[in-house]
Amino acid sequence: MAAAQRWLPGILRRGDGLARRLYSSASSLLFDDTQEQFKESVHKFAQETIAPHAAAIDASNHFPKDVNLWKLMGDFNLHGLTAPEEYGGMGLGYMYHCIAMEEISRASGSVGLSYGAHSNLCINQLVRHGSPAQKLKYLPKLISGEHVGALAMSEPNSGSDVVSMKCKAEKVDGGYVINGNKMWCTNGPSAQTLVVYAKTDIAAGSKGITAFIIEKGMPGFSTAQKLDKLGMRGSDTCELVFENCFVPHENVLGEEGKGVYVMMSGLDLERLVLAAGPIGLMQACLDVAVPYVRQREQFGRPIGEFQFIQGKLADMYTSLQSSRSFVYSVARDCDNGKVDRKDCAGVILFAAERATQVALQAIQCLGGNGYINEYPTGRLLRDAKLFEIGAGTSEIRRMIIGRELFKEE
């Protein structure tokens, strides 16, 4: 504890400034002046508003009770970056969304994951497929941070094979009655608005799935106990329970039987935005490791002077920069209307696996201190691993890329 108290504040303080110097020249190759200014402003906001709570969020497994991070991010206009201005959004592109995801995740992986589920999985689904009435009803409060959003596809026995879901929506007068369960729902315990997929025709396979907008407090809808996760702690995750939950017809998102279209049409962009999360975690690893090896002395000199430590830093740096370049080049293509499924799967596959390795290297650079929870490196490793599993496992991403390449002429 004493060692951490002696080293950690200086490391994080010096690491922040050092990181800005180290990466300013590289980022200028990726961003125009406006995007660079946006990145600096989000960085400052995240470091001042979110980063001070990161360790406590991980330890307590919940967001701070005395600070409403959702509302603060809403006040900073981060939730609706890709949403139309008429609903309170910014009307910007995925370059900006990825920048925000990177910097928030750099400050706290848990907050970054919850932010991504809210702004990307929920808000963007409503933007792309909501009716004018649905957008007017739900988007303003989600964008302001007054309400929290979530999305639920997976079930206890339906993860990667999402089309095999058992949650059923039976058509009745005026709407549908939903019965079943959803699993691993990020933001589930705190969400007021949820996009949920259910089978409206069991015999129709992928053509029998429909997307619904579920509101907290609907009779028959409840959340089970919050899940105790290895990492991304504080980013609330739970099981959703539907017991004869009536959902009015006007809460169908898109059309009946078109749920897979709603799901798949946004999945590529969802993978892209989430891929910026591992970028932020890799940056956070370097924020800690580089200043530490400058200060930590063994054999009479800073350990950063030893070539094997410099080699680790070089590997960490190139993993970060190659991942960052890949993510933002794909984001730029998406903003230009060129959405490539294999590239969107590729960016999160590559960045997620690199982030886990970079976090391991950061722990190794800190040695015994890296294994102590007073330092952030262990948290960064536990957070990074999620991105190899959530939003489609690495194995599924490889399958998507291989399938797309096989189909090409």
UniProtKB/Swiss-Prot annotation:
Q: Where does substrate bind?
A: 160, 206-207, 261, 268-271, 391-392
UniProt transit peptide range: 1-22
Give, as in the UniProt entry, the pathway in which the protein acts. Answer: Amino-acid degradation; L-leucine degradation; (S)-3-hydroxy-3-methylglutaryl-CoA from 3-isovaleryl-CoA: step 1/3
Identify the cofactor(s). FAD
Q: Which GO terms describe its cellular component?
A: mitochondrion
What are the alphabetically sorted keywords of the record?
Answer: FAD, Flavoprotein, Mitochondrion, Oxidoreductase, Transit peptide
Question: E.C. number, please?
Answer: 1.3.8.4
Q: Name one Pfam family in it.
A: Acyl-CoA_dh_1
What is the predominant subcellular site recorded for this chain? mitochondrion
The record ties this protein, via InterPro entries, to: Acyl-CoA_DH_CS (IPR006089), Acyl-CoA_Oxase/DH_mid-dom (IPR006091), Acyl-CoA_Oxase/DH_mid-dom_sf (IPR046373), AcylCo_DH-like_C (IPR036250), AcylCo_DH/oxidase_C (IPR009075), AcylCoA_DH/ox_N (IPR013786), AcylCoA_DH/ox_N_sf (IPR037069), AcylCoA_DH/oxidase_NM_dom_sf (IPR009100)
- List localization entries: Mitochondrion
Catalyzed reaction equations: 3-methylbutanoyl-CoA + oxidized [electron-transfer flavoprotein] + H(+) = 3-methylbut-2-enoyl-CoA + reduced [electron-transfer flavoprotein]
Residues annotated as the enzyme's active site: 270 (proton acceptor)
Q: Where does FAD bind?
A: 151-160, 184-186, 296, 307, 364-368, 393-395
Q: Which GO terms describe its biological process?
A: L-leucine catabolic process
Q: Name one GO molecular function term.
A: 3-methylbutanoyl-CoA dehydrogenase activity
Please report which protein family the annotation says this sequence is part of. Belongs to the acyl-CoA dehydrogenase family.
* Cited PANTHER family: ACYL-COA DEHYDROGENASE, ISOVALERYL-COA DEHYDROGENASE, MITOCHONDRIAL-RELATED
Assembly with partners or alone: Homodimer.
Name the chain's protein. Isovaleryl-CoA dehydrogenase, mitochondrial
Q: What is the lineage of its organism?
A: Eukaryota, Viridiplantae, Streptophyta, Embryophyta, Tracheophyta
